[in-house]
Amino acid sequence: LSETGKILYEDLKGKISGIAENGGSTEFTFTASEYPYSTEADLVKEVKAVLQALLSDCPYEFYWYDKTVGMQYGWYSTNSLASINLTVAGAYRASGTENTYKVDSAKATAAANVKAKANAIVATYKGQSAYARLKGYKDEICKLVSYNDAAAKPGYTGGYGDPWQLIYVFDGDDTTNVVCEGYAKAFQYLCDLDGGLTCYI
């Protein structure tokens, strides 16, 4: 990332973390004085790089994001104002068709409860070797969830959402399961909480 991109990364990371915890709008605006992009093409290129970095670094915080739809960009040359709108998955969208870019606060609160379960798993293996911790995290995930064969089939009509996220892994409900992406995000999240392991999925 460029120096400006790094600043944008930290700004968006803070906002996205807040949305994950409390819900709210996923429409962001900023001015050229904050992030000096000269053209819309420059903005789009940098935002794509920033978003990819955030998706890799923040598996929990993006549980609400529908990456199959993605984001929308806006660039208003008259006042050098730019906008980034991130699409919310249907399961976490605030009621009303106008809320494509708003996370329901109650659903965000419910999602935040899974953090306690994840932290408890990390605490269980604290002080053990790196190998023991990695194996322990893998085993715990496999005990908590099964592969969601239905969601993996071409004819699945449920849309992109929780089967691809880590929420279903730690929600304590054995009827909610995930596909490969959900397993991977859950494993990375435990490694991130561990603090002593570096994991890139």
Where are these regions (language model features)?
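Intrinsically disordered, low-complexity N-terminal segments that are enriched in acidic
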Residues: 1-90
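Intrinsically disordered, low-complexity repeat and linker tracts
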Residues: 1-9, 13, 87-111, 137, ...
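Extracytoplasmic/secreted proteins, especially bacterial periplasmic and envelope-associated proteins
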Residues: 7, 11, 42, 46-49, ...
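Acidic/histidine-rich, surface-exposed loop or edge segments in extracytoplasmic proteins
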Residues: 23-36, 89-102, 113-124
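Generic structural signal for bulky hydrophobic/aromatic residues embedded
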Residues: 57, 76-78, 82, 140, ...
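Secondary-structure boundary elements
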Residues: 106-172
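Cysteine-centered nucleophilic/redox motifs
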Residues: 137, 167-201
